[in-house]
Amino acid sequence: MPVEKIQIRRDYVLQYMVNNDYSLNQLALEIGVSPATLSRVLNGERRPGQLVIGKMLHYFNLKFEDLFYYDFVDKSQ
């Protein structure tokens, strides 16, 4: 049975960090999340919760679909 999983558009965030010469720690501080949380979300180890999604959308001034997408995972496997 497929399950929706919210994923971040990792390439967008990484390119933003390169373009603005930001470290992961600097960006996390700017967004208002812990560096560990940002790292786990970017690496797919953690799904972003509502608070993280809200903070990131506010910081980047983007719509949900511009920064995140739904991935469908088969739970039966």
Swiss-Prot record:
GO cellular component: cytoplasm
Single Gene Ontology MF annotation: DNA binding
PROSITE patterns reported for this sequence: HTH_CROC1 (PS50943)
Keywords for this protein: Cytoplasm, DNA-binding, Transcription, Transcription regulation
Main location: cytoplasm
DNA-binding region: 24-43
SUPFAM superfamilies listed in its UniProt record: lambda repressor-like DNA-binding domains
Domain HTH cro/C1-type: 13-67
Pfam families: HTH_3
Entry keyword Repressor: no
Subcellular location per the Swiss-Prot or TrEMBL entry: Cytoplasm
Name the UniProt record assigns to this protein: Uncharacterized HTH-type transcriptional regulator YvzC
